[in-house]
Regions:
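Active-site nucleotide/adenylate-binding loops and adjacent lid/helix of ATP-dependent enzymes
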Residues: 1-148, 153-156, 162-200
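Acidic carboxylate-rich catalytic motifs and surrounding loops in phosphoryl-/glycosyl-chemistry enzymes
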Residues: 26-31, 213-219
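Residue-level preference for alpha-helix termini and adjacent loops
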Residues: 94, 211-212
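Short acidic-glycine loop/turn motifs at beta-strand connectors
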Residues: 154-158, 220-223
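General beta-strand recognition
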Residues: 160-161, 226
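C-terminal active-site "lid" helix and adjoining low-complexity regulatory extension at the edge
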Residues: 189-196, 200, 207-210, 219-247
Length: 247
């Protein structure tokens, strides 16, 4: 995986520069706060005793995150530069109050370390985002609101294709709502005007980003669209059968 390009700290500033709508976001590079933090987090995960420097790093880390949370406000959306692990919603990215912040940080850090057994996902970049107001069609994965999202693929200045973000198989045995399939089918359709809006933003982004990329568009409760995530195309899930699956 291309961790450097996929990191939110790489693509978000470019979107902001373009004037593309994105959630209010605060980003912190913990390597600049205390270079001992990331090694200390990995040490704790592997059940090793923290030393004095490790404890100092953790204290700084907590202080920075709590300050970020205070500025954004609760509830907030938590992620690293690489992932939010949103399928564990209540235990990772959704932070209802400051009392739950460090618990969710720990869960997200553990997931990141285990995600790649060679080295783990990078965990130096930590992000808090304003929780967008939504009107979910249904909930899944223990309370995660499922709303309208679409993924675009771009390459060298052009739009290759567009797909609904959520395939139906993603919700197998994960939803209590008996009518979720019909709701999903309805929300996975774009009107012609909506496609024009998203195409316009995607083309603007495609002109800025070189190579093969995915763009995730998200609609809030007031029917406004924004970009919530990007990644290199080869590191992004692509609907089966699409001829642009490999760019």
């Amino acid at each position: 995986m291309n961790y450097k390009q996929n990191c939110l700290s790489n693509w978000l500033p470019k979107l902001v520069e373009l004037g593309i709508p994105t959630p209010s976001t605060i980003v912190a590079d913990m390597n600049k706060v205390d270079k001992n933090l990331v090694p200390a987090m990995r040490k704790i995960f592997w059940m090793k005793e923290p030393n004095k420097e490790d404890k100092i790093a953790f204290t700084k880390f907590r202080s920075v995150l709590e300050s970020m949370g205070h500025k954004i406000g609760y509830p907030l959306f938590l992620r690293t530069g690489q992932t939010s692990h949103k399928h564990e919603w209540q235990n990772t990215c959704f932070v209802e109050s400051q009392n739950l912040l460090m618990k969710n940080v720990q869960n997200l850090a553990e997931h990141s370390i285990m995600a790649d057994y060679k080295s783990g996902f990078p965990i130096n970049i930590w992000v808090v985002r304003k929780m967008l107001e939504v009107k979910p069609a249904f909930t899944a994965f223990g309370g995660m609101p499922i709303v309208r999202e679409f993924r675009y693929f771009i390459k060298n200045g052009k739009i290759l294709c567009r797909h609904p973000y959520w395939p139906d198989w993603a919700f197998k045995n994960m939803v209590k709502d008996k009518n979720w399939k019909s709701k999903l089918e309805k929300m996975n359709k774009l009107s012609s005007n909506e496609q024009i809006t998203l195409d316009s933003m995607a083309k603007k982004i495609a002109e800025k980003f070189k190579g093969f990329w995915s763009i995730d568009f998200f609609q809030d409760s007031k029917f406004r669209w924004c970009v919530i995530d990007m990644a290199t195309g080869k590191d992004s899930y692509h609907w089966k059968g699409c001829k642009y699956g490999k760019g």
